[in-house]
Amino acid sequence: MTDKRKDGSGKLLYCSFCGKSQHEVRKLIAGPSVYICDECVDLCNDIIREEIKEVSPHRERSALPTPHEIRHHLDDYVIGQEPAKKVLAVAVYNHYKRLRNGDTSNGIELGKSNILLIGPTGSGKTLLAETLARFLDVPFTMADATTLTEAGYVGEDVENIIQKLLQKCDYDVQKAQRGIVYIDEIDKISRKSDNPSITRDVSGEGVQQALLKLIEGTIAAVPPQGGRKHPQQEFLQVDTSKILFICGGAFAGLDKVIGQRVNTGSGIGFGATVKGESEKATEGELLLQAEPEDLIKFGLIPEFIGRLPVVATLSELSEDALIQILKEPKNALTKQYQALFNLEGVELEFREEALNAIARKAMKRKTGARGLRSIVEGALLDTMYDLPSMDSVDKVVIDESVIAGQSKPLLIYGKPEAQASGE
């Protein structure tokens, strides 16, 4: 066969593994005295992929972090919200322990516990879900509940959520079935009243009904990569009972619903118990007392609430917490901008009074941690625009007056001898 693999004119080349000639395959790759065809390359890739799939479950089983380890990792990235972190750590640990033991333990079937996060805008709901998925090294996708509609109506079908998850892991069904799905703005699909309506509510109660089976566990048929381009391909079957669903929402007004229930026994008229301002529960304290009946009154259907048995409440972030968020986490906002300026060879300093001013401004806007970036971006915009065109800037200092818009950042120049010689 050696004479057939020579590169002389008129000589046919053959694959050293399967023996097919260069005319029988699409591509023949040459190596030192050997050749391999594209078909053999594909076969080798398939064999390697299968071996990786067989080995990976054992590696994951021994690497499952404990609730304490999960909580400790969340502390590195999320400031405050201690009760919510504890609830999440236990729920996530139990979920993946269940998956690693095949949904059963001593013949007892273990149910799935999806999670509902209740908390104001910018309190860290999305960040908690993202951090969990990154730490556990599982596929993660987000969906906005306000874009979802029932199948057959204009909008996004609920099964598109699973397709997005598959896209994140290159359509590997086994990986997708270990993933985490975060559905944001879940409070926006509450029905208009707590009484069943005879009219069709395709973006409220209708979406809740459509999400029921998906969250509880069903076999979702998802078109393969390419979708309608290859209609002859079989649909991918994804078991959603193995996917952890985390739903989050601000639930504005839920505190009033809880307050009505909690204060029912205070009476009216001369027998009423009058509470002073200091005795009244804050919004955060009321949300901690949320019960399924309150969520039903808010507009979630009982069946939907039943699929989200684990409820974690996040409180509104205080000014001190916002200051901590600016400087303490591993990926703190100030550290991100300092790294960005370092790429220009410039040191960036935020003075303590500047951090206080940023936090106060975010508190006034009522946007929580989410509003911090826009405030810092606004303060640094002109500097980031000019800096790449400037020479000899060693340091940029941000103080309170910069955040208030009363002055520009202080630029400290270096190399005075170079400037003097240039003159």
From Swiss-Prot:
Gene3D superfamilies to which the protein is assigned, alphabetical: 1.10.8.60, ClpX chaperone, C4-type zinc finger domain (6.20.220.10), P-loop containing nucleotide triphosphate hydrolases (3.40.50.300)
Keywords: ATP-binding, Chaperone, Metal-binding, Nucleotide-binding, Zinc
Record GO terms (molecular function): ATP binding; ATP hydrolysis activity; ATP-dependent protein folding chaperone; protein dimerization activity; unfolded protein binding; zinc ion binding
Binding site for Zn(2+): C15, C18, C37, C40
Ranges of residues in domain ClpX-type ZB: 2-56
Function: ATP-dependent specificity component of the Clp protease. It directs the protease to specific substrates. Can perform chaperone functions in the absence of ClpP.
Gene name tied to this protein: clpX
Any GO BP annotation: cell division
CDD domains in the record: RecA-like_ClpX
InterPro entries from the UniProt entry: AAA+_ATPase, ATP-dep_Clp_protease_ClpX, ATPase_AAA_core, Clp_ATPase_C, Clp_protease_ATP-bd_su_ClpX, ClpX_bact, P-loop_NTPase, Znf_CppX_C4
Record has Transport as a keyword: no
Domain of life: Bacteria
Record-given protein name: ATP-dependent Clp protease ATP-binding subunit ClpX
Binding site for ATP: P120, T121, G122, S123, G124, K125, T126, L127
Family label: Belongs to the ClpX chaperone family.
Subunit structure, interactors included: Component of the ClpX-ClpP complex. Forms a hexameric ring that, in the presence of ATP, binds to fourteen ClpP subunits assembled into a disk-like structure with a central cavity, resembling the structure of eukaryotic proteasomes.
Organism: Serratia proteamaculans (strain 568)
